[in-house]
């Protein structure tokens, strides 16, 4: 079997989703880190998980959400010196959530993978992305500390068109703690891509509702989405969950924009 795989790889190399270059993948040489605490951390884990989708050069372009970051919104500071601290925006404005964390910077390598997963129907990327997200979850939250994991919902028409909720697929293997019927999107919104900060906030204002208010009362909720850009979507979701007396709402995403 090993010889067959080597021959197959030699004859039919993989194509990098970012640069388009062909490359060879040999599974026996990967030595996969089992979690984000292994040597190399999240960056080594990402390179291993994406070894069949990105060439080694592009995989190494991934920047993990490592300190220093904002202790509240998880903003990855451009300066890589110093300790975690509140960013200027979090100092000036209150957030409806406790903390937000992400796997890494939403730059070219991660952005390309996320686009293929979300828009090009490459749902097979959900597996490695889920493992990456799980590693981030295990790093920042204690076992049993989260009562409900709630993926950000899509509007029904958009869900039918896409065929899947990208946020739900990332956490569906987490078991009964995942509840996709807590939140609902009550109106169709324009895509957030291309909108400025104020336009994004206005676009999602009043776009969500809680289907089961009693289910969230006094619960610690982890809200999951694919990317945190300005935070408009997750902030609106967190706001209505808190309005229904959720004890705390935290945020977990794969990507985090650097603004």
What function would you assign to each model-found segment?
Residues 1-225, 229-259:
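Glycine-rich phosphate/pyrophosphate-handling loop used in enzymes and phosphotransfer proteins
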